[in-house]
Amino acid sequence: WHDRVGFDREWLGDFDLSILFDWDRAGDVIEYGDYTGRAKWERALQVPHQNIRDALISMITVQGDTEFASVEQQRHLLDTAPTDYDRYAGARIMAEEQRHGWQMAYLLMTYFGQQGRREAQKLLERNAQDGDRLLGAFNRPMPHWLDFFCYTMFVDRDGKFQLGMLSTSAFKPLAASMGPMLKEESFHLGTGSNGLRRIIKAGVIPLDMLQRYMNKWVATAHDLFGTDSSTSAHWAYVWGVKGRWDERKKLEGDIDVDKEVLNEESRGHYHDEIVKEVEKLNGSLPEGSDITLTVPHENFNRDIGNFGGKNCYTDGRLFEGSDDEYATYIQTVLPTAADEEALKEIFKQQWVEDKPLTPRQLASGIGATA
């Protein structure tokens, strides 16, 4: 797989790709759904029905697919890293995504027999560069670091929510995998938010252009939560294999669950979080700036869900003009060919504030030979 996608193993430095579990955090007792109170399942044979096993295989497969796909989307960026720190950060993120992919492959191969082994093999056969990864967002090209910073800020944050919802799963090896993955995921989110803050501080990329790239990736992340009323999310909750965001806090607070709109609920939590994160970014804007960065509404530029394919303004209102008029409007709120052309010159400048490597980061060798 490394050779096929063009990832040099030396870029990993001293990073350890070991399989990691946090069994204590996973818990021993099923926490929600029809099997509440029973012991969590530690082997696939303990899972009471084949359709639940199939759902688990599907969830693990999709998660693993996104992890390997991210590396395939991003590996070429190490050639154009704007600073030594960013080369390190990019290589570390790709190393951690690989570890997460291997973790999911390990679960499939260890617990789900021949079916699991087939799915694990396919994780390494599909390729984002060929456009055949399972989720469309993970087949999208990522030509440059402005896309990368927006991606790690917004799309990787969706990943945090997905991992969090699996962290209370009734299938104990899956739940136990999530703790270490969430710890590593926090670095990805920090890379995104710090990267965007450093872009603002450098003052080279126009803020209206930055806003267009943010709009692009926020809309993509909104879609990743799935359809608003999902039967698969409903049954995953009933079976206890995938919970709500902050499930344990909600159970402690006796907050009722609406199983018909679980995806919509988690998307709402995600949206609220990125609004707060972008408000923090606005604290770095130059004094007197006439532009404030915003988060587009959940309805904007959606491909799936109740507003999938509908023409909406960034504030969520339906666009009342023609499709041609909407195409003209979209040119003002999403990246254009002219933006891509302008970035070629911008990237020749110091377009992102420098950030020094710590001695530990330097000693790790991660990304050093890229």
Predicted segments, located by residue:
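Terminal targeting/low-complexity segments that flank the catalytic cores of oxidoreductases
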Residues: 1-88, 110-142, 146, 225-370
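Short, surface-exposed basic-aromatic patches at helix termini and helix-loop junctions that form
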Residues: 109-110, 201
